[in-house]
Amino acid sequence: MKNALINATTKKFEIIEKTVLPITWGLYWHNKFETWKYDAYDEKNVFCFGSGVLPVIGGHRLIFSFRSPLWDGFYFSSMGGAGYQFKSTGLNNVAIIGRCENPSILVIENDGQLRIDFIEVKEELKTVYEVSKYILELYKDKNLRSVVVGEAAKRTNMGGLFSQTVRNGKFVEGSEDWAARGGGGSVLYRAHNIMGIVFFGDEKEDKEEKEKAKKIIESYYKKPMSKVVLEHTKKYRYDEETKTGGTFGNNWLLYKEKVPIFNWRMPYIDKEDRKKILEKILKFYLEIFNKETIEPKRWANCGEPCPVLCKKYRNKNKVDYEPYASNGTLLGIFDLYEADRVVKTADALGFDAIEIGNLTAWVFELLDVGLLKEEELNIKKPIFDYKKITNDDDEEIREISKHNAEQAIKFMHNLAENSNDLYKILSLGKRKAAKILNERFKSRVNKIGKKFNDFAVYVPFGDWGEIAPNLYWTPGFFMPFVIQGRYLTYYKPEFNEPEKLAELVVESIKLELPIENLGICRFHRKWLKPVLKELVKELLGIEDIVEDSINLYREICEYNKKIGYPAKIESERVKDLIIAMAKEFGNEEWTKKFENKENVDEYVKRVLNKYSELLGIDWRIS
């Protein structure tokens, strides 16, 4: 494998010949540069990325790793399809150190000879679409792919990385993806002064290796590979049983009345009322989505030739469950057209949709309960009364959704611009902001009897680290593991005994981390699981990819322990979510135990004890 270490200060690069997977590559450099010693925005926070290494359908993701300004530890995030173009450069992995003097675009090209250059950007580019278009105009005749940041990366900890497929000199509608979790876009811009990366070349994929992989898969399944893929990915393409497709189509039906609403207030809303709200979601979200997306087959892939076509789009909006739950139902928005506006704003500004949705929902509730004031944020209070959704007519629901959407859009613009001192604090994230605001508004805290963090939903790490959970009401996303906000957990709608949950989480890690490190789309995990070890052994020479991945997880743990340790759950809302889950899923023993709220600590402690034992790490709460 050919890899490059690029210095953005000197504009020089070094080629390193080494067989190494993308996340392993990133952690290697973070240990080498001892990045735990420095601020997340120090130029020593090496920004790494690499492409998928197995020549299989779904195997061309681009994986980014960095020390996260949010989580505070080592973090990784990935996007679909971009690795398909990146392989044409002849490189497998890249690491960036140093800092450009002025905002720049990194150019990686290979037309027979590898060239790496930087282009200074003098124009005022604010949205991810403007940066992407700027790059496209420069290299329209190339078979390119770009990865860019937006305004959010410049002044907040929540900047993501955006990429859209280009074909014949034009952007492909719906074929776009994000590596947004953890604030990688913020690191790329604020640590290295890089607004975007563009790559293109003429290196070809090894056809012999591709045939070898296909033979292994078809030998196991005794059927054509294309059929294997489609049979195991119907949720993401089209499910005949549900008559819909994609995460947006199916997750509302799967999680039903447990979908997150109103800043995760589900524990305080009667189940029957939540069912009524679900009816509104199915009417104003799912029915419209099916009519405008599923029926006319507005489906695309991420940019690699994949038949699943998981990207569902309508009205120039790519529609996925988590961005729309975060920036729709979580904000009290139940009109899909209004949610479109909010998601498009979050995307244009370059925010991690999950993180900004959770932050906005928190701020909405702070306004609703009086811990923050309208005049301090220059937005109006949201309409955050769930009974108005269960009781009101359709037109009233549209008006409520429009009002909340307008406040969310204003809030996001103000946050991206850091329009006043309060927005500067909020741009740090919920946990850091809550610590500051608890002191600043002590009298309000005393009056209400609750702290700012009591309304915030996040997983803590160390003294300052945090990440917003994925949009699933399930214990696995609230546990303070070595890394959170990824799918290295167990998230089916269940409530298990702590030791059982730990066992399920570790089993998930054994599948999810290998496919992340190999750069494979997790939508292909079902068909891939039985053949993964053989594929990796035959094509990469790695004897046991699962054991290799567990060792990697242990190394991430050791890195993160240099920064902090698992923290107890600090938020009353998160504790209430865990307590309510025990009741929701009929666990009488824990429902009784949770009558004493402090027993949430016991549950978490037991999960981490078993998790540590199974993984051979020390990640316990004392």
From Swiss-Prot:
Cross-referenced SMART domains: AFOR_N
Protein family per UniProt: Belongs to the AOR/FOR family.
Keywords: 4Fe-4S, Iron, Iron-sulfur, Metal-binding
Cofactor: [4Fe-4S] cluster
Gene Ontology terms, MF aspect: 4 iron, 4 sulfur cluster binding; electron transfer activity; metal ion binding; oxidoreductase activity, acting on the aldehyde or oxo group of donors, iron-sulfur protein as acceptor
Protein name per the record: Uncharacterized protein MJ1185
Cofactor binding, note field: Binds 1 [4Fe-4S] cluster per subunit.
Protein origin, superkingdom: Archaea
InterPro entries the UniProt entry points to: Ald_Fedxn_OxRdtase_dom2, Ald_Fedxn_OxRdtase_N, Ald_Fedxn_OxRdtase_N_sf, OxRdtase_Ald_Fedxn_C, Tungsten_al_ferr_oxy-like_C, W-dependent_AOR
Keyword flag Protein biosynthesis: no
Positions bound to [4Fe-4S] cluster: C302, C306, C310, C521
